[in-house]
């Protein structure tokens, strides 16, 4: 049996008026927020998918369906911690997390240190093991038109 595994996660949510913008568990001041059943934290959803995928446990939708009332407006940090408990129960531990958030606006750099701290705390790893890169889409496509925000994540697990 393999002692290391890598998982890849992806999420995208539409930007809309009347919602808070939450990424990496951080509320970011912006005129729009992400539309979703939960708090729509695309970054944490991508990390959660990467964790579950690496452990062979499906995806975020199979664990926390958007049709379930108990996950309406759910805090994605709570979902991430619950998913990681399932991963640990299978005998896996996170080595590192590398992510990319693609958003034309707002600028993410001022918020990245707190996002990293949140993810590190939720996974019980050192902040140096969490990386977040903020990118724009150079005004191309739906991301460039500020219709949504996309997140990608890679997670390395080791057998414990």
Swiss-Prot record:
Cofactor note: Binds 1 divalent metal cation per subunit.
Reaction equation(s) it catalyzes: 4-CDP-2-C-methyl-D-erythritol 2-phosphate = 2-C-methyl-D-erythritol 2,4-cyclic diphosphate + CMP
Cross-referenced InterPro entries: MECDP_synthase, MECDP_synthase_CS, MECDP_synthase_sf
Keyword Lyase applies: yes
Listed SUPFAM superfamilies: IpsF-like
Single biological process term from Gene Ontology: isopentenyl diphosphate biosynthetic process, methylerythritol 4-phosphate pathway
Cofactor(s) of this protein: a divalent metal cation
A Pfam family that the UniProt record links to this protein: YgbB
EC number: 4.6.1.12
Entry superkingdom: Bacteria
Pathway assigned to this chain's UniProt record: Isoprenoid biosynthesis; isopentenyl diphosphate biosynthesis via DXP pathway; isopentenyl diphosphate from 1-deoxy-D-xylulose 5-phosphate: step 4/6
Residues holding 4-CDP-2-C-methyl-D-erythritol 2-phosphate: 11-13, 37-38, 59-61, 145
Keywords, comma-separated and alphabetical: Isoprene biosynthesis, Lyase, Metal-binding
Family label: Belongs to the IspF family.
Stored HAMAP family: IspF (MF_00107)
Function: Involved in the biosynthesis of isopentenyl diphosphate (IPP) and dimethylallyl diphosphate (DMAPP), two major building blocks of isoprenoid compounds. Catalyzes the conversion of 4-diphosphocytidyl-2-C-methyl-D-erythritol 2-phosphate (CDP-ME2P) to 2-C-methyl-D-erythritol 2,4-cyclodiphosphate (ME-CPP) with a corresponding release of cytidine 5-monophosphate (CMP).
PANTHER family linked: 2-C-METHYL-D-ERYTHRITOL 2,4-CYCLODIPHOSPHATE SYNTHASE, CHLOROPLASTIC
Protein name as it appears in the record: 2-C-methyl-D-erythritol 2,4-cyclodiphosphate synthase
Organism, scientific name: Neisseria gonorrhoeae (strain ATCC 700825 / FA 1090)
Gene: ispF
């Amino acid at each position: 049996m393999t002692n290391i595994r890598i998982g890849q996660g992806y999420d995208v949510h539409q930007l809309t008026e009347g919602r808070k913008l939450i990424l990496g568990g951080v509320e970011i001041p912006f005129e729009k927020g992400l539309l979703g059943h939960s708090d729509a934290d695309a970054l944490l959803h991508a990390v959660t998918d990467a964790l579950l995928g690496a452990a062979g446990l499906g995806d975020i939708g199979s664990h926390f369906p958007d049709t379930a009332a108990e996950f309406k407006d759910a805090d994605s940090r709570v979902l991430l911690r619950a998913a990681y408990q399932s991963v640990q129960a299978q005998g896996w531990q996170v080595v590192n997390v590398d992510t990319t958030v693609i958003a034309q606006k707002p600028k993410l750099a001022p918020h990245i240190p707190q996002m990293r701290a949140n993810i590190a705390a939720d996974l019980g790893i050192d902040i140096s093991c969490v990386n977040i890169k903020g990118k724009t889409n150079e005004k191309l496509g739906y991301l460039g038109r500020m219709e949504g925000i996309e997140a990608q994540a890679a997670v390395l697990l080791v057998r414990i």
